[in-house]
Amino acid sequence: MAIPATQMRPGMIIKHNGELHAVFSVEHRTPGNLRAFIQAKLRNLRSGAMFEHRFRSPDPIERVIVDEIPMEFLYNDGDDYYFMNTENFEQTHLKRDTLGDAVEYLTANLQITVSFFDGVAVGIELPQTVELTVVETEPGLKSATASSVTKPATLETGLVVQVPPFINEGEKIRVDTAEGAYLSRA
């Protein structure tokens, strides 16, 4: 289905140069004496490469309709990640290449949405926040209060985030999946 570039929104899947791309950000720009254009940040769903592309406002964009299926993460075996459809209990496995940075947030029983196009998984949508356990960090200070001072903490999935000094090993914290940043204690 073709739409004008001005109707492109983050989260859409589009076909660009014959390949599927996820739209990450869209900015409408109108420089002084030039025609308006759309600056979009895209991720190639096959290769995972991120790039920016400039579309003219009237350019037709081919929007791809994908099937979004709620699934639950079960486990991983090397580079294979296994998910279960929560409606019919069928299992699907995806390669690490397809998941990209999302693997740093996957824990057992995490509810996610998997996008399928022509029966092939093309990506996943994580929840806004996830709860992860701190496995390694410097000891906390008893008198530490919320301030701009932070320290690195390694989480159960291997993700490293900056946390306040009062966070200790073994604590569960809430992490923003879009920014990869500490939000609060769980």
UniProtKB/Swiss-Prot annotation:
Keywords: Cytoplasm, Elongation factor, Protein biosynthesis. Involved in peptide bond synthesis. Stimulates efficient translation and peptide-bond synthesis on native or reconstituted 70S ribosomes in vitro. Probably functions indirectly by altering the affinity of the ribosome for aminoacyl-tRNA, thus increasing their reactivity as acceptors for peptidyl transferase. PANTHER family: ELONGATION FACTOR P, TRANSLATION ELONGATION FACTOR KOW-LIKE DOMAIN-CONTAINING PROTEIN. Pfam families: EFP, EFP_N, Elong-fact-P_C. GO terms for biological process: peptide biosynthetic process. It comes from Acidobacterium capsulatum (strain ATCC 51196 / DSM 11244 / BCRC 80197 / JCM 7670 / NBRC 15755 / NCIMB 13165 / 161). InterPro entries: Elong-fact-P_C (IPR015365), NA-bd_OB-fold (IPR012340), Rib_uL2_dom2 (IPR014722), Transl_elong_fac_P/YeiP (IPR020599), Transl_elong_KOW-like (IPR013185), Transl_elong_P/YeiP_cen (IPR001059), Transl_elong_P/YeiP_CS (IPR013852), Transl_elongation_fac_P (IPR011768). Belongs to the elongation factor P family. It comes from the Bacteria. The lineage of its organism: Bacteria, Pseudomonadati, Acidobacteriota, Terriglobia, Terriglobales. Pathway: Protein biosynthesis; polypeptide chain elongation. This is Elongation factor P. SMART domains: EFP (SM01185), Elong-fact-P_C (SM00841). One of its GO terms (cellular component) is cytoplasm. The keyword Transcription regulation does not apply. One of its GO terms (molecular function) is translation elongation factor activity. The keyword Cytoplasm applies. It is found in: Cytoplasm.
